[in-house]
């Protein structure tokens, strides 16, 4: 049996994000270790996905990078506070990230490729915990979030389609607002169709 787009339902299975890798974060940086300018940008939750307003020394960066968890190029960074679930693809350039507020899954790409994860995250698969007035994404929220995955080959096919739509949306960013909105809605429709399936039992 196949679904729209030619995806065979029997190829899909449901897993928890915690099954594909450890949830990781950088070493805590103390305020005294930062400065308004310097060698290595330090992204806090307020500057994540934007321009940094704090920096750390190259020595501190190299020390912590070698001793503690640090993302690999292509890993998908997730904001656990502020704008919950905002994602940034780590580009491999020297940078450091605020502990606990910015996390990633040290993903096993033999199970799920990072770019597929990036698009899945846009669907916000996690349940957000609230304490008082502050919403937060805890490690357990991420680890227990369920996603549906096909074979690696099918993941690559889906990513290829969504990447093309993504590029198309960006290419018309200078166009008419109505045209841009229509294209974005089309992109979101196909993204949801390709990624959203009823929960399946693990094979």
Predicted region positions:
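Short, structured motif recognition centered on aromatic/hydrophobic residues
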Residues: 12, 17, 40, 75-77, ...
């Amino acid at each position: 049996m196949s679904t729209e787009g030619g995806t065979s339902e029997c190829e899909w299975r449901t897993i928890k994000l915690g099954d594909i890798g450890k949830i990781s974060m950088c070493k805590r940086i103390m305020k005294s270790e930062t400065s308004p300018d310097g060698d290595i940008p330090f992204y806090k939750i307020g500057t994540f996905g934007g321009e940094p307003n704090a920096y750390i020394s190259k020595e501190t960066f190299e020390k912590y990078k070698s001793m503690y968890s640090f993302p690999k190029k292509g890993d998908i960074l997730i904001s656990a506070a502020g704008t919950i679930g905002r994602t940034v693809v780590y580009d491999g350039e020297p940078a450091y990230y605020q502990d606990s507020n910015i996390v990633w899954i040290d993903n096993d790409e033999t199970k799920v490729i990072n770019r597929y994860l990036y698009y899945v995250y846009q669907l916000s698969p996690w349940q957000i915990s609230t304490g008082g007035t502050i919403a937060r994404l805890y490690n357990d929220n991420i680890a227990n979030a369920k996603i549906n995955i096909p074979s690696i080959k099918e993941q690559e096919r889906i990513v290829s389609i969504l990447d093309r739509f993504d590029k198309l949306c960006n290419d018309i960013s200078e166009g008419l607002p109505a045209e841009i909105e229509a294209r974005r809605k089309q992109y979101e429709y196909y993204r949801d169709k390709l990624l959203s399936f009823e929960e399946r039992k693990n094979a």
